[in-house]
Amino acid sequence: MMLKPSIDTLLDKVPSKYSLVILQAKRAHELEAGAKATQSFKSVKSTLRALEEIESGNVVIHPDPSAKRAAVRAKIEADRLAKEEEERKIKEQIAKEKEEEGEKI
């Protein structure tokens, strides 16, 4: 049985089989968790989708994993702060509308 993408083409993209397996597993978990895909897929399974992305060069090993983790944490924090700000604005708007409604009565 011939697998697509082939191991030979995948090993051209990453330095070792170990690195390939780790990269594929991490990307498959990201896809399962709802990460945006970088392309359209032929495969249904997230593990094979990850291999397709690796083959196309859309997913690569980050040269500095600790920097990537820090960037991910920073993005999560920025998203959290943006959500809190949006909720604060909504609460202010609701309070303002209630105040205006109270003045009309």
From Swiss-Prot:
Protein name per its UniProtKB record: DNA-directed RNA polymerase subunit omega
One annotated GO molecular function: DNA binding
EC number: 2.7.7.6
Catalytic activity of the protein: RNA(n) + a ribonucleoside 5'-triphosphate = RNA(n+1) + diphosphate
GO cellular component: DNA-directed RNA polymerase complex
Subunit annotation: The RNAP catalytic core consists of 2 alpha, 1 beta, 1 beta' and 1 omega subunit. When a sigma factor is associated with the core the holoenzyme is formed, which can initiate transcription.
Keyword vocabulary terms for this entry: DNA-directed RNA polymerase, Nucleotidyltransferase, Transcription, Transferase
Disulfide bridge positions per record: none
Role: Promotes RNA polymerase assembly. Latches the N- and C-terminal regions of the beta' subunit thereby facilitating its interaction with the beta and alpha subunits.
Family affiliation: Belongs to the RNA polymerase subunit omega family.
Lineage: Bacteria, Bacillati, Bacillota, Bacilli, Lactobacillales
Highest taxon listed in the record's lineage: Bacteria
Gene source species: Streptococcus uberis (strain ATCC BAA-854 / 0140J)
GO biological processes: DNA-templated transcription
